[in-house]
Amino acid sequence: MKIGYLGPNESTFGYLAAEKFFDQVKKTEGLETGFEFTPYKNHNEVCYAVGSKEVKYGVIAVENVIDGVVAETIRAIDNIDGQFGLKVCAEVVVPIELFYMKKENNGALPKKLISHVVALRQCSHFVSKMQADGVAIELRDSTGAAAQEASTNPDIAVIASNNAAKICNLQILNKESVTDHKNSLTRFWIIGKEHANKTGKDKTCFLINLEQSVSGSLWKALGVFAERNINLLLIYPCPIPGKHWEYTFLIELRGYITDPGIIDAWSEFRKLGLSLNPPRFIGSYPDVTSQ
C-alpha cells in the first residue's frame, strides 16, 4: 500500500508522522506486510496523488500549536477535493524540534539560511538574529529539501530536524532546539477517499464559502451548531485566490457526521443559503488531541 508524504526524503516531519501512524496501524491490525512511503514536493502534490489514486493515503501537516493552521494544506484540500474528492480519515501528532545545522562546523557564518516557511516562523527569534548578522533567509518546499541542499554547500545553513542531520550528514551547531517555544507539536491529517468509522470520540470538518454581502453570515453559520450544543474546535479563514476579501472557512467540530445534532445543523445551514458554493464535508475521524 502506497502512502504519500512531504519529501524529498525521510528527513521531513511528514515522513515521521507517516511512519508513526502507519506503524501503529500495522501493529493494531496485525499486518505482516509494510507500507511503501512515497515522497512528494509539496502538500498539493500529496493531495493530488490521493485524489487521483496514485497512493492510497496521504499525510499532510494541518496545524502547529505555536504557528497555527498550515494555510498551504487547507488550500490544497480545497483545490483537490473539488476535482477528485478527498476525506480526512485520521490525525496524528508529532513533537517538533528544530535545529541549526551546516555541512561543516567551521565557526563561520553561512551566506544564507534556508528552510520551510513554517519552520522559519517557529524559530523567528533565531532567524532575526541571523538576519541582523547579514545572513540571507530563503524559503524551500520542505525542511528535508532544505537539508538536502545544505548537504552539498558549506555556505548554506538550514533549520531542520535532528533526523535530517543524520540522513543528510549535517553538523548540528546548537545542541538545543532553536524554536521560539519548547514543547512544539504539529498535527497531521491522514487523507484518503473515505472517512473513518465512528469511535464515539470524533471530529468532523467542513469547508464553506460564506456570502459576504449578507449581514451576520458567519454568526448565523456558527449559530446552527451552537444551538445544538456542538463544540466548535477550529474556525480558519483561507483567502480565495483571485477573489479579494473572500474566504473559504475550515470548520472543525466535535462529533461524527451521522450524529443527529450534526445532521440537523448541517441541514439547517444548507437551507439558510449563506454559502456561495455548495458547502463540503471533508471528513470525520478519531479525535486524538482533545482532553
Residue spans for each PLM region:
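Domain-level signature for soluble enzymes in the chorismate/prephenate branch of the shikimate pathway
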Residues: M1-Q291
